């Protein structure tokens, strides 16, 4: 089994006219939400074996409390910056086989589209509720957790994952 955690960066300050989008920082609410999501990861036992994080400032700030709560080796990946869903899935497929739990910290719309691409159709009411929330919106700071009955990340494919959790900062 493999578990993929998709965490969208927390709420960021709007960029100024002379500010590069890559350099935007978290808003006060974003800092609070990032802390809450990090505590949630720990409380749920979502201990990643590896973290892949976009190189943007807001994703770096989002992952900082995560590293305190659930420390793991991290790689900052330029290709995750505003990555489309196919690129996100491809990065997961490239993960080493010894990694059972992979956390990716990035941006929308790519993360939301990737979660929707990989999640199978819900079969139970609880799954249906999670899917409905995911389809409604993948807000800043939200986390989607997908489980795959595969032995290698290379076998990751569309509609093959079970959406076992979807949580937004406001849910905590």
Which ranges hold each PLM region?
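A structure-centric signal for secondary-structure junctions around beta-strands
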Residues: 1-2, 99, 140, 160
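Domain-level recognition of soluble alpha/beta enzyme cores
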Residues: 119-164, 169
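Glycine-rich phosphate-binding loop signature in dinucleotide/nucleotide-binding domains
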Residues: 44-46, 94-100
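Conserved histidine-centered catalytic loops in small-molecule metabolism enzymes
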Residues: 49-67, 74, 147-172
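Active-site-proximal alpha-helix that buttresses catalytic centers in soluble enzyme cores
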Residues: 2-87, 111, 117-125, 138
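A short beta-strand-loop-alpha-helix capping motif that often carries His-Thr
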Residues: 105-110, 114, 146
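Beta-strand elements within well-structured catalytic alpha/beta cores of enzymes
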Residues: 3-7, 100-106
